[in-house]
């Protein structure tokens, strides 16, 4: 099962920069983007654990240069039930949300 990497920023421009850095830094797939409200935005990537860690590290650095980084997290083995509640693309759904 693939890991799930997430980055949350305040502001869309920082999230776009972070997302670009993530997919360029490691072999990950961008599986979702969510605008939460209050300026908060989250991007989610899937890949192996090392790739998600490298991607989120690069994305976090990029987001901090452009705007405000709020949170970064990697879940090594997300449970399959998460897909029923959260838009994390566990079954190959790569649409941006």
UniProtKB/Swiss-Prot annotation:
<dbReference type="InterPro" id="IPR000249">
    <property type="entry name" value="BMC_dom"/>
</dbReference>
<dbReference type="InterPro" id="IPR037233">
    <property type="entry name" value="CcmK-like_sf"/>
</dbReference>
<comment type="similarity">
    <text>Belongs to the bacterial microcompartments protein family.</text>
</comment>
<comment type="pathway">
    <text>Amine and polyamine degradation; ethanolamine degradation.</text>
</comment>
<dbReference type="GO" id="GO:0034214">
    <property type="term" value="P:protein hexamerization"/>
</dbReference>
<dbReference type="InterPro" id="IPR044872">
    <property type="entry name" value="CcmK/CsoS1_BMC"/>
</dbReference>
<dbReference type="GO" id="GO:0005198">
    <property type="term" value="F:structural molecule activity"/>
</dbReference>
<dbReference type="GO" id="GO:0031471">
    <property type="term" value="C:ethanolamine degradation polyhedral organelle"/>
</dbReference>
<comment type="subunit">
    <text>Homohexamer with a central pore of up to 8.6 Angstroms diameter. The hexamers pack into a two-dimensional array. Interacts with EutQ.</text>
</comment>
<feature type="domain" description="BMC">
    <location>
        <begin position="3"/>
        <end position="87"/>
    </location>
</feature>
<dbReference type="InterPro" id="IPR050575">
    <property type="entry name" value="BMC_shell"/>
</dbReference>
<dbReference type="GO" id="GO:0042802">
    <property type="term" value="F:identical protein binding"/>
</dbReference>
<protein>
    <recommendedName>
        <fullName>Bacterial microcompartment shell protein EutM</fullName>
    </recommendedName>
</protein>
<dbReference type="InterPro" id="IPR020808">
    <property type="entry name" value="Bact_microcomp_CS"/>
</dbReference>
<dbReference type="GO" id="GO:0046336">
    <property type="term" value="P:ethanolamine catabolic process"/>
</dbReference>
<comment type="function">
    <text>Probably a major component of the bacterial microcompartment (BMC) shell dedicated to ethanolamine degradation. Each homohexamer has a central pore with an opening of up to 8.6 Angstroms. A positively-charged funnel leads to the pore from each side of the hexamer; a phosphate or sulfate ion is found in the pore. The pore probably allows metabolite passage into and out of the BMC.</text>
</comment>
<dbReference type="Pfam" id="PF00936">
    <property type="entry name" value="BMC"/>
</dbReference>
<keyword id="KW-1283">Bacterial microcompartment</keyword>
């Amino acid at each position: 099962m693939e890991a799930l990497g997430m980055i949350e920023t305040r502001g869309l421009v920082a999230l776009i920069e972070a997302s670009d850095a993530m997919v360029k830094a490691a072999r990950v797939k961008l599986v979702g983007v969510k605008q939460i409200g209050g300026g908060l935005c989250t991007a989610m990537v899937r890949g192996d654990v090392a790739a998600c860690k490298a991607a989120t590290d690069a994305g976090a650095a990029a987001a901090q240069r452009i705007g405000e980084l709020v949170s970064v997290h990697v879940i090594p083995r997300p449970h399959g039930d998460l897909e029923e509640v959260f838009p994390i693309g566990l079954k190959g759904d790569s649409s941006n949300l």
